[in-house]
């Protein structure tokens, strides 16, 4: 579980401040420009998320610099490091960012890579914020209070997907998921909600993400005879979907953010263009046309926008925390991160607007590009917006946006 750092030193430990100061360069110094590190997948199954992550970070920094930078100093381009979807390489990349003395790390992309790197980053007392890691297990990590995320936990996403399945009239569901932090947490959330809604879960099964043989899974799904199939996967899920379609399984597919790809119908159904017509999915998103238009203007070649609002918010909310603390040192500004997104403050929607309110001595409630973040004590957002995407006869479309909150009213 998160433990918030205690930053004040007792008198008896005053001498230790000399040591602490000497280590400043290793954990984000307070000596000028605020430098972001970006830990993202240039290769691997989530490499398609790299372009929107880079664009969102650069876009956020450009708006911060247009407003005068952080504490009046221009923010330099982010230090980039490739986590490649591999634990060893991710740790090497995280160490590179730590040794470069960045003031904050944005990333990693997947929950597994965040699990593999948070100890290196937060253990060095550097703030880490992921805009796309959604595993519920990340709410319970021992990070000293330095890990935050703007992507909602799958404990929110699971119920939204389950409710959509039931709303579409299905009463029996087969759930298949990756056997990793992302897949198992999401599966549990979906299954619990389906059970609560009175649906019959005829199959609940995980598979090795590195497998190339889905025979046992396909057999299990076929025997489950469910109305709907909830598939919780990344890129490898296209192979499983294609194989299930070949067996002519008579079920409707429901997907998660890992397969939120407008070109999925072309990837899977070369021989049967209508094979995934009717497929629906749920993914964290933002019902924010103004942000989307701004990002398109900033990065006109960008064609994947998934998690871009959440990544943008990681950068912006950290910069605002530094402004509120009057410090770029993560050991100082980290305690202000929850405060700049709390409902007790004055609502504001941009770095410039929020910074000006802080300069006037006001508390702020940053309303992010992805929605009202409102971090809880675990560094998780307590509200989120999800898009319901769909493949119809005319191709990919967004059917609806669903707001979900974990707050107890």
Q: What residue ranges belong to the model's regions?
A:
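Extracytosolic ligand-binding ectodomains
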Residues: 2-10, 17-409
